[in-house]
Each structure stands twice: as C-alpha cells, then as structure tokens.
C-alpha cells in the first residue's frame, strides 16, 4: 500500500490542483522560519523552491521580499497558477528526484514536499541539495519526527509521507557539507511542523 501511495503523489497533485489551491492556508504561519531562512542566506540572492505548488504563500512571500525565485513542481496545473500570479519568476515542471539545474542558489527550500518521498528517495536528495548549493547557501525542509511512514488523506485518496530518523538527517547533512543552524520538532508556533534549517559550509 505504501509503495503504491508513494508512487501516486505526483498524480494526486496533478489531478487535484484546484482542491489544493482552495484548501492551502495563506495565513503564512511559516513566516518566522522563512525569515530565519532569509537571515541565513544573508538577506539577498536567489532561491529555489522545490515542490513550490501554486506559489502561494511561500514563494509569494520570498518574491515580495525581492528575491529571484525558481519554482520546481511536478504538477502542470499548479505551475500554471504560479506563472499567472508571478510571471516574472521562473517556474519549471520537474520531478525533484531527477532535478536538472546547472546552477547554484543562495537558498534551497523544500517545505511540505520533500516528506512525500520514500526514505530511499529522501536519502538521494542530499547529493542534489549539495549540487545546487555553494558555501553560505541556506537549506530548509520539513520532515517527520522519527524514522517511519505516515499516511494522510487528500480528496479521499491516501497521501504518503515518510521520514528518516533525526540522526540520519544530521549525518546526511554533514556528509554533504551542511551544518545544522536550527532544528525544531513539532513547532507549536508553526502548525506542528518539524523543521530543519542548515547552511552549506563547504
């Protein structure tokens, strides 16, 4: 069940883009963490939003702060909404697991997207984070609290989530040149999200 649900993630977001857009909160409860991310970046530069969805509210917040943004998503319908809202930015239809970008960014964010990958695919993302970053780049992503799989539901379909253990995330970050700046389990001020903020050191 979990393997088929993991393989169905892109299909769900492609078929239910309108439902996601209507249900996604725009309250920006993430703001304090987005501001921390900006601070680690140095307050300026380019950002890649991996799993950007329709661009609201996270990509939109960065754009309003003056950042040049590249949004990556596997749902054409969501990207169409993002392009309509922010035509001056770059929006690319790609699977994050096979991300092809021949450049580095000052900030990399995978908020509520990376955790839809299987544990094996999450492990394989760290060389991609490494390749897309340079010394000083900020990286932020959300995860679960411990090693395991959790099933949610969206539009009456099973919605796959997975997580590695915190020690494994720390080891993967370190192995690919990132130092953890801050990590918080189930932040009560951020809708219970577990958040990792790191910086490329070498």
List each language-model region with its residue ranges.
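Conserved class I S-adenosyl-L-methionine
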Residues: 1-42
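Class I SAM-dependent methyltransferase SAM/SAH-binding core
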Residues: 48, 54-98
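A conserved beta-strand element that flanks and buttresses the S-adenosyl-L-methionine
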Residues: 109-110
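A short glycine-rich, Lys/Arg-flanked "PGG" loop and its adjoining helix->strand segment in the class I
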Residues: 123-135
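Conserved beta-strand signature within the Rossmann-like core of class I S-adenosyl-L-methionine
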Residues: 136-143
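Short "lid" loop at the C-terminus of a central beta-strand within the Rossmann-like core
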Residues: 144-149
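Acceptor-substrate binding/catalytic loop of class I
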Residues: 151-167
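Core SAM-dependent methyltransferase catalytic element
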Residues: 185-202
